[in-house]
Design a protein with these regions (language model features):
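Alpha-helical transmembrane bundles and membrane-interface segments of multipass inner-membrane proteins
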Residues: 1-237
Length: 237
């Protein structure tokens, strides 16, 4: 039995009320904070574990020493084969650049950029998303986690701790090489924070591309219906 009520809430102007902004929603904030905290914790824990266990001895990082030598590296070590067929190794690297080692020796710029990006992401979450845009909130939280995880390393150690090396023993065919001279299929070493950043961006791009059309107001719907009826009447006449 129908109650006769409309399933939508209407504003005084006849506009069908949309999802409220995310900043008004406790659920949205909880999603953002919980996912971000989990991601940051996972990233920092994985880095700590790797630098304590991958080499023969725990690698102690001295911030002043690393800042004084832009080519500072952990002591030589064999690394750990994680997946067979040379798919993944754990190999310790200190990255003075951005994601996958891009832009070396620009520490201050990356710190300022990361702080700006984190602030912008929070603003976009608060006023640029709706309360029920849960997937977007997860994507933004993953970006925050990745950015903050690497920012922590830049401030505390002077560089970012990386240890994930995909396809370490796979070479490019036909003696090809990358601009830096590397012949590996994937010569970059990365970390969990980098993965979180890329996953977050992928979620946001996907959700933005599949976003539904906004709900129309009662007035615009009524005007469309009137135009359709007028067209039918003209055809019938």
């Amino acid at each position: 039995m129908s109650s006769g009520r409309s399933p939508h809430t209407h504003s005084p102007t006849g506009q069908v009320s949309a999802d409220p902004p995310a900043w008004t929603s406790p659920v949205a904030w909880c999603t953002l904070v919980l996912v971000a905290v989990f991601g940051i914790g996972l990233d920092l824990w994985s880095k700590d574990w790797a630098f304590e266990n991958v080499a023969e001895r725990p690698v102690v990082l001295d911030r002043d020493e690393i800042l004084a030598d832009s080519d500072w590296r952990p002591p030589p070590h064999e690394g750990i084969e994680v997946l067979p067929f040379g798919l993944l190794d754990f190999d310790l690297v200190m990255n003075h650049g951005a994601v996958f080692g891009i832009g070396q020796d620009q520490r201050t710029i990356f710190i300022v950029f990361t702080i700006t990006a984190v602030t912008l992401a929070l603003v976009i979450f608060a006023v640029g998303t709706r309360a029920r845009s849960h997937a977007l909130h997860v994507g933004i939280a993953l970006i925050l986690a990745g950015g903050i995880g690497n920012l922590y390393d830049r401030i505390l150690f002077g560089a970012v701790r990386d240890f994930l090396h995909m396809l370490p023993r796979w070479d490019l065919p036909f003696s090809m090489n990358w601009p830096n001279g590397s012949t590996g299929v994937f010569p970059w070493v990365f970390n969990v924070a980098d993965m979180l950043l890329l996953l977050g961006m992928a979620i946001i791009v996907f959700m933005t591309g599949t976003r539904k059309e906004p709900v129309q107001s009662d007035d615009s719907i009524s005007q469309k219906n009137d135009r359709i009826l007028d067209s039918k009447n003209e055809l019938g006449g």
